Curated annotation (Swiss-Prot):
An example Gene Ontology CC term for this record: extracellular space
Family per record: Belongs to the Arg-specific ADP-ribosyltransferase family.
PROSITE patterns in the record: ART, TR_MART
UniProt key word Thylakoid: no
Protein name: NAD(P)(+)--arginine ADP-ribosyltransferase 2
Amino acid sequence: MELLALRWVLLAGTLLSTSAASSALQEGDLGSITVIMDMAPNSFDDQYVGCAHVMWANLQKLKCTEFARNYAYAVGWRKAAAEWQKRWGYLAHPMQLRPEQAIALLAYSAASNLYQQFNAATRQGGCSHQYYVHFYHFKTLHFLLTQALFALRASQPRCYYVYRGVRGIRFMTQRGKSVRFGQFTSTSLRKDVAVNFGQDTFFVVKTCYGVPIKQFSFYPSEDEVLIPPFEVFEVTNFCTGNGRIQIYLRSKGKMSRHNCELLKPRGGQWGRGHQEVGLGLSPGLALPVLPCSNCSCWGSGHRAGDPIPAAV
């Protein structure tokens, strides 16, 4: 495949005007901002249906190109590759994931600014084909994380009840609304872990496309479950009280506006149109409702807005 030219450098701060800052806010930040949840229409949500083999064939060259243009990505990958070598480099038997997939998960979960840059870019990377081609410098990381989650889910397809805590951001929505995170979103199987990341907004989520990545995380004690950007959720409850928000989400299926986006210039045989998959409600038990202390539950909201930055 003839690789597309990557010609311009993404200007610092471009995404900040349209997306929320990371929930890992530093001490001393003043107050909380308000962000409205929606279907994240600008998200880059490719599932690479029918073209994964082509992406794999060109992965190394594209990855080197992105490393040259993205210092944080190159450094994060190098650190993750060293960790992979330490954990599994001398195993005689094959792993559940390819080395590149495992390294991608390690790089995402590391304590660095890579995941923040990646999530901010992913929330806006699908606003147009040209924007994706020229400004989205995480094409390989997105592909590898997507493939890793597919591979892990294939071995144990089930739903999980998870939690997500956010500090410094109050998310607004309404009961019955369909929403997406629009990025790879970290959650935890443990409520106490999620609480430590913040309670300005606290999510209780039933995910059927997110998968546990404990084995491939820099911080296995966090019991992380990683949710892909294309999973759709129904808001089953929205509570507010004592300056805090609680949002309950139930998996509704998955939806992508992009497919094989990188290959579109080669004749348009891939990635045409608006792809929707499995928008029926996922089977299983109803989402458990936890008590909201001194809060009211809303059934209405205001307007649509940005998806959620990584908190865990």
